[in-house]
């Protein structure tokens, strides 16, 4: 993590946001351990701004935690903790093989293993979403400096292949080419 260039107030805000997300995930895990005393383990895949915060890629406030995949048994707890599972509509913004690139969230848990999608998968999904805050998220040095551009090219092709109309496909390709030109 490169906090060197952040002023003290932004560092404090970042630490508070990161700690809030981590504490929520740890509490969810603790509650799941109370509900289920078996040896079963569960998973939750986090995406969006919260994933980028957990990966030390962005340093802004995010109001929600989004999950695109989770074990069915923990879904009532996710709902209780206001972890948004309604982003499954955006699952088409992720290549089919995104699970092959999952990154474990480095927190100690007993029952629930938390993951984020890869940085490349997050960039593709945010290029698909095409909102101003999404562009801001993926234009930080922490995101752009270590991207695997060959993988990015393939992921863009995979997502475009699954798009329903030519307009969305062309729009994504143009956004990606612009992004690539500015940050590669």
Task: Enumerate the predicted regions with their spans.
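Compositionally biased terminal segments of proteins
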Residues: 1-184
